[in-house]
Amino acid sequence: MTSTQIMEGLRLVAQEHLEYEGQLDPDASIIEVLELDSLRMLTLVVEVENHFKICLEEGDEEELVTTSDLVELIRRRLDEDAD
């Protein structure tokens, strides 16, 4: 899956489950852009897992600063699941 496809999937998750209507800037703070508090972060994690059919590990969210960080995390999990 390409970065563009992952970014589009994230945009859909944000739109459907976090009521976010804007574009996702790869270099922007994902916490600020999506206005993530602990409950919204949990929603994002669960819906990303469901959408991409991956399993994120406890603590994965701690390495998320930008949207690109989340894209890279999803890509790693997809690659791990493919092995």
Predicted regions and their residues:
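Phosphopantetheine-dependent thiolation modules in NRPS/PKS and related acyl-activating systems
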Residues: 2-36, 40-45, 50-83
